[in-house]
């Protein structure tokens, strides 16, 4: 089990995309960067690149500016430069198959139809890429493309900061400990959202069979 030294947050660049569900990976990546010690921010590998330290370890954050479907271009450039290895990165992205308020970490697997992750898998030539999926749920009365490219609704906004904080902490746990998936088990983090109150949500970590 390799520890993680690069967090890659997926999304689309531009102000019009900043508040959309599809950009939740960007939000988590920025939250991770805010938790690093002595961060340095620059432009590299077709995106924003942040170097820093966490728990005594060097860790970097990459926010690709290539648009979602070409996220692999940014990751492949970092791999070619020797700045990361596929098995030691954690890709953070939105997931339609998980309800809002739930995140799930896995060590490897297919893309599940997510074009950003598929671009990365194609670019590095392997599916053994750790990933952290952040649930956005499926639309009830809208096309999927319109839904992911739309802003968060009012109810989601109430719990969004809790979700982002929890996902950032989960990513940094992977920096400390690696992505802990044993045999055929899935690491799932359920969030008890603190809606209508000011209390923090509690994290419940459960290992579930696939």
Question: What feature does the model see in each segment?
Answer:
Residues 2-108, 117-133, 139-143, 158-165, ...:
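Nucleotide and nucleotide-moiety/phosphate-recognizing core
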Residues 181, 192-197:
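Intrinsically disordered, low-complexity regions enriched in serine, threonine, proline
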Residues 186-191, 199, 203, 210:
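Alpha-helix boundary/capping motif
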Residues 78, 206-207:
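Surface-exposed flexible segments
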Residues 107, 196-201:
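Residues in and immediately flanking transmembrane alpha helices
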Residues 104-110, 148-153:
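Short glycine-enriched, charge-decorated loop/helix-capping segments at active-site entrances
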